[in-house]
């Protein structure tokens, strides 16, 4: 018998290498690992051991003696085996002394090894059973019938795409079968490769299985999601009314007269600086008012107000008529397809002329009902409160005609009216609920931020637990200040709200980056043309988001030739040290609107010489910036002739050129002035003086009545009788 390694022997007898190593160690044969080479006699001993074990297994199978316990049965079998061995050994006669002695020695060794083996088997309870355990799986496999193929499903659904493995699992087939079918269709695919819709449909049609693709709604873009409510779920909701009109025509005063509060007195300069939302009750029915500022710089906010509104009240002063901002308001309302009620205010004034107002508004297709049109006109006085009841009745009448309804029994959806950063409460947002009911504790996504509604306050300053459709509320609990005009939506849990909020913020960041880096050829040409244009860098900080947007829009509208406004940063809150550092690095001016710099910011501004401009009225901001931009422009110059000299004689000097011997006839000739050479009334050359001398000395200027020597830079064609005219470019103030 030849030599073999441990693992080869184990493989031959279908036993683990560990068992073979264990047996060899019990036989006092040193083995290191499964690669150890076994001698022929060692292999023979191992064969003998495994043969004995298999015989014992066979005996146990046929006899099956009654055993009180497995341990006792093992003892009994061991003793019986040893007795048989002894008897056999005694019965055999000795042929030769030497041979007998050798055989006895061999037998004694074998018996000792067997005894050790069985003792180990007793302790472990494993020895004689190993062969049985190894042999069992083969018989089981032989008995098992072939696997039946799963029945094909009638229909499968998928979302987006499926891998080959996923499709095979859904169809109850092996991936190799799917890969084969794809190969036959000309598609080379691996088990983890994504399949498109066409490939999935081809495979499924081959098996006769229907395919349905699930359409997933991207909730991160919830502004575009339209949820259609059942008609029976809809209930009547209050109308949302926006008051629009020209500055100082009495919008805020009218709203105050309606809700009996004095908002105008709190506003700087008597002009509303940001949107406020209020709710009033009239004849048992509620009306929500949005006060959109009338100054034209707030065009962005007014457009946003028209998007959330149901009815527009166009306030026109009876003594002033239609103004530019009145026309703007009409255009915004028409663009939003919102019905207009015209309120002719200031009827208490003696110079009031409502007919003129109605005549002017007819040019914009606002024809009064009394003149055969369909626009409601209300004559009133906000100051004396005359005609206000009639206006409110008209609002309710129009809202009934519009059939304004919403479903309150769903997750809330709406728009941010205003947002600000409060020192004590953190980010605060005024929300207008447009559908559903907003409750305290709701997980909410607002624009690109998220949070949980911690507290809700109505327009009266009272805490409320829920807000239904068309109700404005101020909420806290957001992680950041949203943008005015952002949409909000309530989600089922805070985890999902956080994921969607973060995803929206990330998407917005990517969009901003792509806008900054994307350049078309047209833009590139424009930038090249604007290469010499100066930029005025600004950092804008304001008390509320609406004011920030309004200031940015107003400043960017300023058009001074040669200067471009660049808003480096615009945000809500006080002016901080980080704003000053940003201004330092970008060479910017900081504008604060209704905010002040903190102590650290003041100190940093003083040390870095950063210009901070603080204002409370928007007109002043625009005027001051315009003035600054005019100062930054390249100054305008005008030509001023300072003297004339007549060429009396010329001298040609090598390495110097032509020297003109002149006599100053008028004014003076200076060394730094520009000159033009005039010959017979025609300008021959314009340039600069190279040298100016009187006798042999260089002089700064030569006055009238004196002679001098002049050389003109890069020009030598000077003749007697020519006139040298000296002039300077003088800076003049820009108009």
Curated annotation (Swiss-Prot):
Chain segments carrying region G4: 345-348
Basic residues composition bias: residue spans: 121-133
Keywords of this entry: Cytoplasm, GTP-binding, Initiation factor, Nucleotide-binding, Protein biosynthesis
Region feature (G5): 381-383
Region (G3): 291-294
Skewed-composition ranges (Low complexity): 134-145
Record's keyword annotation contains Methyltransferase: no
Record region (Disordered): 52-154
One GO CC annotation: cytosol
Pfam annotation, one family: GTP_EFTU
tr-type G domain span: 236-405
Function comment: One of the essential components for the initiation of protein synthesis. Protects formylmethionyl-tRNA from spontaneous hydrolysis and promotes its binding to the 30S ribosomal subunits. Also involved in the hydrolysis of GTP during the formation of the 70S ribosomal complex.
Protein name in the entry: Translation initiation factor IF-2
Organism: Geobacillus thermodenitrificans (strain NG80-2)
Name of the coding gene: infB
């Amino acid at each position: 018998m030849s030599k073999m390694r441990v693992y080869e022997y184990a493989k031959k007898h279908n036993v683990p290498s560990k068992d073979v190593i264990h047996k060899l160690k019990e036989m006092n044969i040193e083995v290191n690992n499964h690669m150890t080479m076994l001698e022929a006699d060692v292999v023979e001993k191992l064969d003998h051991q495994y043969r004995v074990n298999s015989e014992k297994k066979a005996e146990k199978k046929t006899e099956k003696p009654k055993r009180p316990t497995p341990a006792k049965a093992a003892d009994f079998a061991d003793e019986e085996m040893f007795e048989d061995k002894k008897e056999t050994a005694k019965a055999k006669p000795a042929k030769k002394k030497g041979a007998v002695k050798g055989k006895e020695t061999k037998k004694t060794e074998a018996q000792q090894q067997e005894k050790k083996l069985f003792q180990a088997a007793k302790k472990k309870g494993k020895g004689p059973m190993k062969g049985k355990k190894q042999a069992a799986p083969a018989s089981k496999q032989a008995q098992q019938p072939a696997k039946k193929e799963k029945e094909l499903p009638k229909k499968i659904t998928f979302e987006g795409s499926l891998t080959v493995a996923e499709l095979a699992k859904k169809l109850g087939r092996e991936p190799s079968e799917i890969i084969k079918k794809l190969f036959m269709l000309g598609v080379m695919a691996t088990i983890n490769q994504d399949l498109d819709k066409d490939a999935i449909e081809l495979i499924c049609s081959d098996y006769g299985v229907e395919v349905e693709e699930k359409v997933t709604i991207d909730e991160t873009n919830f502004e575009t999601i339209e949820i259609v409510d059942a008609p029976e779920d809809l209930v009547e909701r209050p109308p949302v009314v926006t008051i629009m009109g020209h500055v100082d025509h009495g919008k805020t005063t009218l709203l105050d007269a309606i809700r009996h509060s004095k908002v105008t007195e709190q506003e700087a300069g008597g002009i509303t600086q940001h949107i406020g939302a209020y709710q009033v009750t009239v004849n048992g029915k509620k009306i929500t008012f949005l006060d959109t500022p009338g100054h034209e710089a707030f065009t962005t906010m007014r457009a946003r107000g028209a998007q959330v509104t149901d009815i527009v009240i166009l306030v026109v002063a009876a003594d002033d008529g239609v103004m530019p901002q009145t026309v703007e308001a009409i255009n915004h309302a028409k663009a939003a397809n919102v019905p207009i009620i015209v309120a002719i205010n200031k009827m208490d004034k003696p110079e009031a002329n409502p007919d003129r107002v109605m005549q002017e508004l007819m040019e914009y297709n606002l024809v009064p009902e009394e003149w055969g049109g369909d626009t409601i006109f209300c004559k009133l006085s906000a100051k004396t409160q005359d005609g206000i009841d009639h206006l409110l009745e008209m609002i309710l009448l129009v809202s009934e005609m519009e059939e304004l309804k919403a479903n309150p029994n769903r997750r809330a959806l709406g728009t941010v009216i205003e947002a600000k950063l409060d020192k004590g409460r953190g980010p605060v947002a005024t929300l207008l609920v447009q559908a559903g009911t907003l409750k305290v504790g709701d997980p909410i996504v607002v624009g690109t931020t998220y949070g949980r509604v911690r507290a809700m306050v109505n327009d009266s300053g009272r805490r409320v637990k829920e807000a239904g459709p068309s109700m404005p509320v101020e909420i806290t609990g957001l992680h950041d200040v949203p943008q005015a005009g952002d949409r909000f939506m309530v989600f089922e849990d805070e985890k999902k709200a956080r994921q969607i909020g973060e995803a929206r913020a990330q998407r917005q960041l990517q969009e901003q980056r792509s806008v900054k880096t994307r350049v078309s050829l047209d833009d590139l040409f424009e930038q090249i043309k604007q290469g010499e244009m100066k930029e005025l860098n600004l950092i804008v900080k304001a008390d509320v988001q609406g004011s920030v947007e309004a200031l940015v829009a107003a400043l960017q509208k300023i058009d001074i030739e040669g200067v471009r406004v660049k808003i480096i940063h615009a945000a809500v809150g006080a002016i901080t040290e980080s704003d000053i550092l940003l201004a330092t690095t970008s060479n910017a001016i900081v504008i604060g609107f209704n905010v002040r710099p903190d102590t650290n910011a003041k100190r940093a501004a003083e040390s870095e010489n950063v210009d901070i401009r603080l204002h409370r009225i928007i007109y002043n901001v625009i005027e001051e910036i315009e003035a600054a931009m005019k100062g930054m422009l390249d100054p305008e110059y005008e030509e001023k002739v300072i003297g004339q000299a007549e060429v009396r004689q010329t001298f040609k000097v090598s390495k110097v050129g032509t020297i003109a011997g002149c006599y100053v006839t008028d004014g003076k000739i200076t060394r730094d002035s520009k000159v033009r050479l005039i010959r017979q009334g025609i300008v021959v050359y314009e340039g600069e003086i190279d040298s100016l001398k009187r006798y042999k000395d260089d002089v700064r200027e030569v006055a009238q009545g004196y002679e001098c020597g002049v050389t003109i830079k890069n020009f030598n064609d000077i003749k007697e009788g020519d006139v040298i005219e000296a002039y300077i470019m003088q800076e003049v103030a820009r108009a």
